[in-house]
Amino acid sequence: MKNRLLLVLIFIPCLLSAQNGYYFFTESDISQIRSAAKTEWGKSIIESLKDTVEARREYPLTVPLLEGGHIHDYFCPEHKVRFSFDWNKPEAHYCSQCKHYWTGNKRYDWAWVNVAHTHNYTYLRNCMYLYLATGNKVYAEYIRNMLLDYASKYITYLDHDTARKVGPWGGKMFGQSLDESAWASDVCRAYMVAKSIMTTNEIREIEKGYLIPCSELLLRRRGTANWQVWHNSGLIALGVALQNDSIINVAINDPECGYHAQMERYVMDDGWWGEGSPTYHYYPLRAMLLSADAVRCRNINLYDRKLYKMLAAPASGVYADLYFPAHNDGWYGESLIAQVSLYEIAYQRYNKDPFFLSVLQQCYRYTDRNFGEALQNNIEIPQVTAMAAWPSVHFKETGYAVLRSGTKTVVMKYGPHGGGHGHPDKLSISIHDGEKEIVSDMGTCAYGVPAFTKWYRKTLSHSTLTVDAKDQKESTGKLLA
C-alpha cells in the first residue's frame, strides 16, 4: 500500500511540473481518474481500454505513408452503407450488404487512410487514459512511439484537399483541415500526458515534425461555422502543447474567426447551433467543450451560460428512446447515447448539474459506462429504470417544437433553412410512438453517395407539403399558435 501511495505522489507532480503551467489535466483531474480506476465500475473501464489497446496492437502500428482523403467516400455507392474496415486491405473495401469488395477506386483507398488515422487517434486517447489511471509507463511509451512515427511522416505529406488538389480548406494528414483539427484536438492531450517520459530530442522531433507544421497550417485556415470551431479547438490544443499563448489567443479572441466570434454568430439564444441538426450541433459542441477544457491551464473560463445551453438544448429535445429526429444534414439514427461522454465532463464542470445527471442516468439505461471521460467524473451514477418525464419544449429561434404526451412525441419543424446544411423541409413533422419513429425525417446519407443530392435534399423525401413535386425555396416558416 505504501509503495502504491508513493507511486501516486511521485507520478502526479512529475506529470504536472514537466509542463510549466501548460496542461490538459489538473492535479485534481489526475487524482480523480486514479481514484475512479480503483472502483468496481472504474476497473471495468480500465479493462475495456486495455482490451481496445491490445486489439489495436495486433495489427501493424506503422503510420500510413499516403495522405488521407474524405471519409464520406468510404461508403458503398449502391447500398449507402459504410465499408467494413480491414487493416490488411487498404485497397479492397467490403460492403456488408452486397458481400462484395470494391477495388480500383482511389477515393476509397484515400478514405481508408482516414479511417486508419481515426483508429490511431482512438488508440492514443486510450493509452492516455491508461497512463493517467495506472501510471504504467508502457502506455506513455506507446504514445511516444506512434507520435514519433507521425512526426516523421507528417512533414512529407503534401497539402491537399479531397479532390487531391491544393485548396483553401485542405489538410496534410487528411483531405480537410476540419479533420486535421479534430485529430490534433485530442492527440495533443495524449502528447502532453506522455511528454514527461520523452527525451529533449524526442520532444523536438514531435514539435518540428508535427506540432509546429500543423499549427502553421491551421493558422492559415480562416473559415466560419463548424469548420472554424474545430480549427480553433485544434489551435488551442496545439498552443497548449507548444506552450504558445499567441496561438491560443488567436483561436479564442480573433474578431472574425475566434471562439467567441463563432459562438456569437452561430449559437442561437435557445442553445442550438445555427445549422439546425443534432449531428451538426454536437460536432461543433465537442470542439467547444475541448476548447473550454484546454484553456483552464491558462486561467481562462469558457464554461459560461451559453455553452451550458448548447449542452442542455439538444438533450431536452430527444424522443423517449433518446434518439433524435434527423433534421437537415443529420445522420438518421443519431442518439443522445452516443454523446454521453460529453455529459460526463459537463456534469463535473457545471457543479454537478441535476439535468446533466438525469441525462447520464437515461443514457446508461442503454449503454455501458466504458468511457475514459467517466474516470474524470469520479462518482457512481445512480441507476434508473423509468424513462425520463421531460416536458414539451419549444425552440423558438431554431424553429421547432417537441410536443410530448407520456412517451409519445410529435416534432414540428418550421424554422430557418439551416445554412449550407439545411433542407427544403419547412412545416415538416416527425412522430415517435414511444418505441419507434412512425413518421420520419430521413436526414442524410454520406455526401459522397449520389442519393445525397438526388433524394435526401429534396422536399419530396420529407414529411411535409410538396407542390407539383418541386422543392421548396429556402425559407423560414411561422408558428401561429
What are these regions (language model features)?
Residues T134, A194-E205, L242-S246, A294-Y303:
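Inter-helical turn/loop segments and adjacent helix faces that build the functional surface
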Residues T224, I248-A251, A261, R265-W273:
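A mid-sequence, solvent-exposed acidic-amphipathic segment
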Residues H119, Q176-D179, W227, P255, ...:
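Secondary-structure capping and boundary motifs in well-ordered enzyme cores
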Residues G234-Q262:
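Alpha-helical cores of eukaryotic small-GTPase signaling modules
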Residues R4-C14:
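Sec-dependent N-terminal signal peptides
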Residues P424-A481:
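Active-site rim segments in enzyme catalytic domains, especially the processed small/beta chain
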